[in-house]
UniProtKB/Swiss-Prot annotation:
Keyword Nucleotide-binding listed: yes
Gene designation: thrB
Stated name of the protein: Homoserine kinase
PANTHER family xref list: AMINOGLYCOSIDE PHOSPHOTRANSFERASE DOMAIN-CONTAINING PROTEIN (PTHR21064:SF6), AMINOGLYCOSIDE PHOSPHOTRANSFERASE DOMAIN-CONTAINING PROTEIN-RELATED (PTHR21064)
UniProt keyword list: Amino-acid biosynthesis, ATP-binding, Kinase, Nucleotide-binding, Threonine biosynthesis, Transferase
EC number: 2.7.1.39
GO biological process: threonine biosynthetic process
Family as reported in the entry's similarity comment: Belongs to the pseudomonas-type ThrB family.
């Protein structure tokens, strides 16, 4: 279970006394998620999520994340809304960790998204980008192109233990992407981690977007590239162009891509795949003793990179004018 910090009943009761959310009826740890400690709270007033932020989330970034969720929720986006204390603060401390309570969203994530899910996700992504357009705070993407070589340095010596010639392939990818990475694309607030487990559905419609703790200021099309990687590959490693077409068309129905974004899409998809391959590789090679959370397979994204290297045109992802 992804509960890294144990919370005694007495400490939780004292923490909740600062909130106007009714009396606690029950609570339980949530197994999903690998970055933070999460609990489901059931009170006399409703259901909530309590999150304790562990070491991978920088405390100085929390005002950005919490402010963004409040901003997006106020503009009608279905996302967790931080619950403020009676004193008006959203961020507290519990068992030595920064902690926040957010609203509970109905819905379930899908493990095997279909074309209709990809279409709904494209609309939701465009809605997120629009809702965040006037958010005043900025946060640079700490896992963009400048971070990839330092990440690789943590794993380079052992990379070929994971797959033959992985280090050589990665060095070539880094050189190519660092040379050509676009810096002038339309941008603003992006989610940057919109995998299937961070999107809730009721039926075929998106009911909520969660886990904004990689959100940052970057290119909108890079966010789309992350989603194409996460949603449109099949278990056998093939790219499903029908899903890609549905996602891109739905996104463009709300926010048409500019020609320079379309031209950059193959490069952005390569970069998105490399980013997740590298963070997974570092985690794979540094599993702490006794860890209960299994690291994600970096080779899934090595295989996706092999596809992206062959792509020369955004049409291969399903884009059409």
């Amino acid at each position: 279970m992804a509960v890294y910090t144990e919370v005694p009943d007495e400490a939780l009761g004292a923490f909740l006394s600062d909130y106007n959310i009714g009396g606690l009826l029950s609570y339980k740890g949530i197994a999903e998620g690998v970055e933070n400690t999460n609990f489901f709270l059931h009170t006399t007033a409703g259901s909530y999520i309590l999150t304790l932020y562990e070491k991978r989330v920088a405390e100085q970034d929390l005002p950005f994340f919490l402010g963004l969720m409040e901003h997006l929720a106020a503009r009608g986006l279905a996302c967790p809304q931080p619950i403020r204390t009676r004193a008006g603060t959203a961020l507290g401390r519990l068992c030595g960790r920064p902690a926040v309570i957010v609203s509970f969203l109905e819905g379930v994530s899908v493990r095997r998204p279909g074309t209709r899910h990809c279409r709904a996700l494209g609309r939701a992504l465009a809605g997120l980008h629009a809702a965040g357009a006037d958010f005043p705070m900025r946060r640079p993407n700490a896992l963009s192109v400048e971070a990839w070589r330092p990440l690789f340095a943590q794993a380079e010596a052992q990379a070929d233990r994971v797959a033959p010639n992985l280090a050589e392939r990665t060095r070539a990818d880094l050189a190519r992407l660092e040379e050509a990475w676009p810096s002038d694309l339309p941008g603003g607030v992006i989610h940057a981690d919109l995998f299937t487990d961070n999107v809730f559905f009721i039926g075929d419609e998106v009911s909520g977007l969660i886990d904004f703790y990689f959100a940052c200021t970057d290119a909108f099309a890079y966010d789309l590239a992350i989603c194409l990687n996460a949603w449109c590959f099949e278990p056998d490693g093939s790219f499903n162009r029908t899903k890609g077409q549905a996602m891109i068309a739905a996104y463009q129905s709300a926010r048409p891509l500019e020609p320079r974004e379309v031209a950059s899409l193959p490069l952005l998809c390569q970069g998105a795949a490399l980013r997740f391959m590298l963070t997974r590789l570092v985690d794979w090679l540094n599993v702490p003793p006794g860890a209960l959370v299994k690291p994600k397979d970096p080779l899934e994204y090595d295989r996706k990179l092999a596809f992206h290297r062959r792509v020369t045109d955004a049409a291969e992802y399903g884009w059409s004018p």
